[in-house]
């Protein structure tokens, strides 16, 4: 029992934490949604919940079944064996009155009441209950021979109740109870009140460690659960103390007539007889009320997968279809007055699924996961493009001395040729012929798991499996990972028009210019004010039939239907989200090899992985390429005198000889690190079909599915023929309940038994659970392929996918047909007068507009001098709009206007189609090496240490006698590298190891000392000395050619004298090339500068005269790459050289940079979503411009930027079980598994035969693994941190109040909180006031500098909003500026958890009134604040929307700097934080103000 609790505790805590969020959501949604699918019943004005049972009359019993009332009549027992039966009040059936002295005394005990309704059982296993009452009396046994009449003996002791039987299988879960009204606020938080009920009985509260709140009112009764399966009979217990006399049992059925006995004589009264054996079980009584759900049974064996169920009957007609196409938009109505802001709307219904979003940018690399089990080897990939040559590696250890080669034929010494001009890059040579395939090597170590192949076609229908036992209801699982973005939904209708924007300040009237020509059509302006609703349009045409509606309420259990036709295979579904990593399955049989997939695109280079496990030795590789020339070694000590060679000059290097024979197999080398995953190879031929696999291990039992619809009632079966009567056998042990036999002939009257009270008539029982699985049937033949199934219902709308990278520009499309004319936009406000254009041709005369109002007749004056500009007059009444005249010809385009302020967001446009995939971006710079992981288990021998300093070559010692082979010792720690010994004799060539990963680039070593002279070669004939050619002029430097493959090893050159180090000079202008100087030593590497813009190509310099060839300088250290230089002019073509010998095969290069994008191919199918890119830092918020005049209504814009990911939707219904997956690759026990499971010992005995494969073998060694204890201890610590988080970034609290309750000793300061729970990645840093429990979030930025923000020639004493109206002003933001949306989301949850909010705002002023106007003695010029719900908070008016002032030194305009401190405190937490501020007394050039935004605090 305690073990169960310990296992359940972590899950239980997760359930409790989930419950907090669910309860909050439920409180929001219950008020709106009512009671979901459950339908109550009403009878005689009384309302009953679904599944309620009641008795409207004594002899009638009813049940509410989803709105339908089912009643049944109670039938009474025909005969009561008593003198005067009595019918109790309110009951239907009479019972025997229990009189004293009748042997049935009840000792004052009252009648047994009706069975109460089951309460709500929490998902907590309680302690084991007491034994149940004794079963019903058995039926009467066969009549025995008549015995002598005995005296009645005293009542024997009653036996102790037997132990309870095996718990029955759990019933299907009942439907949810009707939601209760929310209880009053508890002392703690809403979740505490919910947990208080659990705390009273189960003790759960004390385990979880929550502070209980006050108990809410009891909710209405939940529905009745289904009856659990009857448990088996327990063993008979030892006799108990005498119990109270039981009620009289029912009369047993009459036994068969026995043979007549001989009449015996009356005997002496006998001794008390022993208690008789328990009689056979009586016939089953009327069905009782369904019992409370039983305890979860033991986990059964995994059942076989069942066949696909029969096709259901045709569903009810679907709900109303989708709306027809949107009708034409009505004419724009007149502009309505602006309405007050409405309260926040309720949560709308889930929208239709959007279209699949474009792929998002790749995400940040996640933290390195644990080392996975090595997967099976992937198929070899296509060879990658040749990469750039890697940096020169560190010098390797000195190799063994090779065998002496044969002397080559002497060649003639050629004369040195003239240096040729630098040739242009040659074209790449043709691809060489494919080599013959090598012999098959031993199997490699398992590679990483391959990407999942395409879904195979549906296989033939399998044999119907035996039904599995119903599984135990599991605890609620953790929330699954966020699913992949769903496809784009269909285009939604045009959204409602937004609210009317704020009216801008009145502009000065301009001088009336002459009418300009009609300009070209302007760019679309900002969205205008919305018009009032138009008249309702005509009724649309009948829409198409809508999709199938959501499933209706669950019907009552029907009779089993007849099996339907096999369904057609459904359409292929979308790829599901990757599931949670399941437990490692048993090793399945090897499947047939699948067809090779198409080669995928080359992936981006991943971060360097951990070294793989030691692989098996690979096949012998081909001969390696010759290495680069080694640096000269130290001069060796003279060796022993060699045999005299023939003197001769050194001949030229002979051609490379053919590869030698394979040497003997060398010792196994240390394993190289795992190479990069190769690309998938070309598709191989399809393999032959594999043999059918063995029957798989039965899968885990699936979750209990929803009850199916009620089937049609089956026909009654035929009656079987009666069997032959058998001979009476010996009396056996009491059996279980047998089925009722055929009615026997009436026997003689038995002795009347004690009459028991009749039980209540039970309700018709629900369908019983599935029977135990029958024996395994023979394997059936493969069924024929079923007909195609009907398409499934549309899936629920997926989450919107992440925003994909912009695609490449597509080819210019053909010009489309002219679209329908857009809606007439509302009239824009008057723009500034443009500069006078040239007079255009006169347009056609428009229709005359209606006559305007008569003006006042003015007195004609003499034309005076132009006066100064007057103040703006009030606008005259607007005349009625005339009908639009015909379009005039296009005029000259006007000057470009200034940038307008950002308009209000436009209405949501139709989602555009997904853009094409953009060209691949340039390869990113290789990232820095990741941090070192924790030390692993004992690994293979470490990497070779850095080579030590060269030792001198020791004298050659005499060869010692060979020693005997010693035992192999454990690998010791790496010693310091010793001095290099003399070269040993050449060993046999080892097999080529696996290509290692590229090592980190080492610094270039210092040049070595000259090596020892080689043995003199045979003398070749002296060649003729050629004439020395004249030195050619130095050609201009050509552009860098491609990196060539390594050439054959050249002879070592003589050491040159090192040049002196030159001083690092400043970079001068580029001069003409001078004569070639002596090479200087390598300068110190400079820090890499930024890549400059490519310069213009320089003019070709004059060639300098050739300088003498200097001795080669010492190789300097390799510098860091400099900036890209300008591209030089192309050199002249050199003479074509002789064709060289074929070079050695080069190393496989690294992957090259991606080539330029090719022409656009045909539209491919949607690819696999790429990884998310790292999120770029958001740019700084720019200042808002002045509010522009609203322009005409623009065309429908492109789809908007994808919104942030919404909150997780409600959990959908469980999907149907998928087909069984293919068998996984054989796994390897990794070190981590070895730690926990213990090391498998091959000498362990096999499992005993009496244990089946899925049971644990007995552990005779009884090992205890310390790794398990450490894991449990770590898990316990993590759970403790989950229960009481400490406010760190890794373990954020939910609110500061929670933190205060869990850690009352903590001081006030900054802590991390995560109000929406879930991932800790979106936790925010806040200030916690530990004295009050307040959670305070700071503004960002927290102040506005004091200056003149608003200048107006005619201040009109109206509030001017800093964020909306003023240039460079913006509304106040809160939280981290790098992720402002996170703070907004968290504040939404924080408001749900808080009952009060407060905030202070400080207005810093100079010559500007903040609150009280000292001159006018009123509050007309007080600052106005705007809350988060767009509510204006003022100095006067309704007290709920009024702030208080803590300090005010801004009442006088005396040139001093003052400040006014406002405070607003409210229990409507949606009004805070303050997001904008509007001073009234601003506009003058000497008026300045600034703002300090205090943190908003919730408690």
From Swiss-Prot:
**Could you tell me where the Pro residues compositional bias lies?**
170-182, 236-248, 919-929, 1171-1181, 1211-1226
Q: List-wise, which residues carry 3-hydroxyproline?
A: 919, 1156
Annotated GO biological processes are:
cellular response to amino acid stimulus; collagen fibril organization; eye morphogenesis; negative regulation of endodermal cell differentiation; skeletal system development; skin development
Q: Where is this region: Disordered?
A: 104-1268
Motif Cell attachment site, residue numbers: 506-508, 944-946, 1067-1069, 1070-1072, 1100-1102, 1127-1129, 1136-1138
Binding of Ca(2+): at which residues?
A: 1314, 1316-1317, 1322
Does this UniProt record's set of keywords contain Cell division? no
Annotated localization? Secreted, Extracellular space, Extracellular matrix
- Any Pfam family matching the protein: VWC
User: Residue spans with biased composition (Basic and acidic residues)?
Assistant: 710-721, 776-787, 1063-1072, 1127-1141
Residue stretches making up the VWFC domain? 39-97
Q: Which GO terms describe its cellular component?
A: collagen type V trimer; collagen type XI trimer; collagen-containing extracellular matrix; endoplasmic reticulum lumen; extracellular matrix; extracellular region; extracellular space
Q: Which stretches are tagged as biased composition: Gly residues?
A: 732-741, 894-903
**Keywords assigned:** Calcium, Collagen, Disease variant, Disulfide bond, Ehlers-Danlos syndrome, Extracellular matrix, Glycoprotein, Hydroxylation, Metal-binding, Repeat, Secreted, Signal
What is annotated about its quaternary structure and interactions? Answer: Trimers of two alpha 1(V) and one alpha 2(V) chains in most tissues and trimers of one alpha 1(V), one alpha 2(V), and one alpha 3(V) chains in placenta.
Family note: Belongs to the fibrillar collagen family.
Question: What PANTHER family would the database entry show?
Answer: COLLAGEN ALPHA, COLLAGEN TRIPLE HELIX REPEAT
Task: Please quote what the entry notes about the protein's domains.
Answer: The C-terminal propeptide, also known as COLFI domain, have crucial roles in tissue growth and repair by controlling both the intracellular assembly of procollagen molecules and the extracellular assembly of collagen fibrils. It binds a calcium ion which is essential for its function.
Task: Write the protein's name.
Answer: Collagen alpha-2(V) chain
